[in-house]
C-alpha cells in the first residue's frame, strides 16, 4: 500500500492550482473595487439624507458641499459645519459631480435649479448617486 504522492501528481496539482488562481485573482480585484464603490455610495446617500433630515428638524436651510479635489463631502447649516466625510480616503475612490453642492430648504425640498449627480469611481467599478431637485436620492 502506497502512502505518498509522486512528483508527477504534485506537479499536476500545482499546475491546476496555478491556472485556477490566475483566473480568480483578477475577478477578486474587480470584486473589491465594487465593494469600495458601493460603500462610498452608501455613505454619500446617508450624508444627503442626513442633511435633508437636519434641515427639516431645525427648520433651516442645510447645505451639502462636494469637494472633488479633496474627495470629501461636507454638510453645513446655520454657519456651522455639521458633518464631514472624507469619502476618497476612507473608501479609496475618486469623486466627480455635476455641481459643487446642493441645499435643502426647511421643508426638505432641494434648493437650486438642477439635479445633482455624484459619480464614484475606483478602477473599472463605477456608480452614480442622483439627487433630484426635490431632494430625492437614487443610484
Q: Would you name each region that the model predicts?
A:
Residues 1-5, 138-139:
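N-terminal leader/signal peptides at the extreme start of proteins
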Residues 3-15:
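N-terminal signal-anchor/signal peptide hydrophobic helix marking the start
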Residues 11, 19, 23-139:
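N-terminal helix-rich module
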Amino acid at each position: 500500500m502506497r502512502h505518498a504522492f509522486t512528483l508527477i501528481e504534485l506537479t499536476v496539482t500545482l499546475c491546476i492550482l496555478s491556472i485556477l488562481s490566475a483566473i480568480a485573482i483578477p475577478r477578486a480585484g474587480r470584486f473589491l473595487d465594487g465593494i469600495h464603490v458601493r460603500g462610498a455610495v452608501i455613505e454619500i446617500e446617508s450624508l444627503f439624507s442626513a442633511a435633508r433630515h437636519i434641515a427639516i428638524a431645525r427648520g433651516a436651510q442645510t447645505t451639502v458641499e462636494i469637494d472633488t479635489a479633496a474627495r470629501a463631502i461636507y454638510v453645513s447649516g446655520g454657519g456651522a459645519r455639521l458633518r464631514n466625510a472624507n469619502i476618497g480616503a476612507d473608501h479609496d475612490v475618486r469623486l466627480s459631480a455635476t455641481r459643487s453642492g446642493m441645499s435643502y430648504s426647511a421643508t426638505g425640498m432641494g434648493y437650486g435649479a438642477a439635479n445633482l449627480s455624484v459619480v464614484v469611481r475606483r478602477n473599472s467599478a463605477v456608480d452614480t448617486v442622483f439627487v433630484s431637485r426635490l431632494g430625492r436620492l437614487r443610484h
